Design a protein with these regions (language model features):
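Mobile, glycine/GP-rich and aromatic-enriched active-site lid/loop segments adjacent to catalytic centers
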Residues: 1-87, 170-321
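Generic, well-ordered alpha-helical scaffold segments in large soluble proteins
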Residues: 33-37, 102-110, 135, 156
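Short, surface-exposed, charged/polar-biased interaction segments
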Residues: 51, 94-97, 114, 121
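Secondary-structure transition/capping motifs at alpha-helix termini
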Residues: 66-68, 109-114
Length: 321
């Protein structure tokens, strides 16, 4: 087909389109918005910020979005580990919406009957509330407030667990985060009101998640995955990232052998502190989790006929698989 007949939203030009040219075509109102605030995008460089939105991963789940190791837990949406390195944004939104609907269907057909031991659950809940209450009382005496503790963890994650990674930085970050988490369990972080108490409890969860994530990233780098997705791995023996960048910016190239594999991380716990808090297992330089790669689940090769598939749906057989 001649190029002139292909619908195209951009001006046809023999030269590559610049960002401002694309913006003039796609969303000229944005240019005017900046002009209204004294910024001319045609003349001034625009500072950009980088976020780790596509640092994908999540809880392992079945094709019905049920956790593979915690029955009756349904991690739906971007908390699910089905979001891969190169997934498009539309599929992520679709997975959340369709996943919630499918999970609700599965729950209605498989878990409609009451299965909770109320007495045992109440006893466990009371024990946990007692533990957390003790921790919160302990935390009031801490000389570190929850805001400072949170910021230290966030800065470390942005520096080591985002788009630019290196093994030496990750080694240090894992050790620092393990120390932070152990101190957090022993001493807590101070707060001044009920909202601060909630945030202090969030610090426990966030720091544990940060530690587990950093350990998983370190394992991936050690395994030789290389630079892929939304992260580059700095390597002095790697390839030059760009001719205008110095030797600091040499990166480990992607190892394509990992494209059909998924990294699985399983957390371990050992003893508890007197307050009931879970302690890390072993030395802080060792993972409190195990990591391994397994093959991605293949897309099923199905030759179902409509009549049989519809019958299986009507009779509820689909919820048995």
């Amino acid at each position: 087909m001649p190029l002139a007949l292909i619908p195209h939203p951009y001006p046809l030009t023999p030269h590559p389109l610049t960002p401002i040219t694309r913006l003039e075509t796609m969303n000229p109102a944005t240019i005017q918005l900046y002009l209204d605030h004294g910024i001319d995008l045609r003349r001034e460089k625009l500072e950009i910020a980088l976020c780790a939105q596509h640092n994908n991963g999540g809880l392992a789940g079945t094709h019905w979005w049920e956790s593979t190791n915690l029955r009756h837990l349904f991690p739906v949406g971007e908390v699910n580990g089905s979001h891969g390195v190169a997934r498009p944004g539309g599929s992520a939104l679709n997975a959340g919406q369709v996943g919630a609907f499918r999970a609700a269907e599965y729950i209605a057909h498989r878990y409609a009957d009451w299965s909770l031991d109320v007495e045992a659950t109440t006893q466990l809940a009371q024990q946990r509330v007692t533990e957390l209450t003790h921790w919160c009382e302990l935390a009031k005496q801490s000389n570190i407030d929850w805001q400072s503790d949170r910021h230290a963890m966030q800065r470390r994650m942005s520096r080591c667990g985002s788009a630019i990674r290196s093994l030496p930085e990750l080694e240090a970050a894992v050790s620092e985060t393990a120390q932070q988490y152990e101190r957090l369990l022993r001493e807590g972080v101070s707060f001044t009101d009920h909202r601060g108490q909630i945030e202090a409890l969030r610090n426990r969860q966030l720091t544990f998640a940060a530690l587990t994530c950093l350990q998983a990233i370190r394992f991936a780098v050690q395994s030789g995955v290389g630079s892929r997705g939304s992260a580059i791995v700095l390597d002095p023996n790697g390839v030059a990232l760009h001719e205008q960048l110095d030797e600091t910016w040499r990166i480990a190239p992607e190892n394509a052998d990992f494209r059909d594999k998924v990294l699985v991380t399983q957390c371990k716990v050992s003893n508890r502190y007197p307050s009931g808090n879970v302690a890390l297992q072993g030395d802080r330089n060792q993972d409190q989790a195990t990591h391994y790669y397994e093959p991605c689940r293949p897309i099923p090769d199905s030759d179902l006929w409509f009549e049989t598939a519809w019958a299986a749906h009507r009779e509820g057989q689909i919820y048995e698989t």
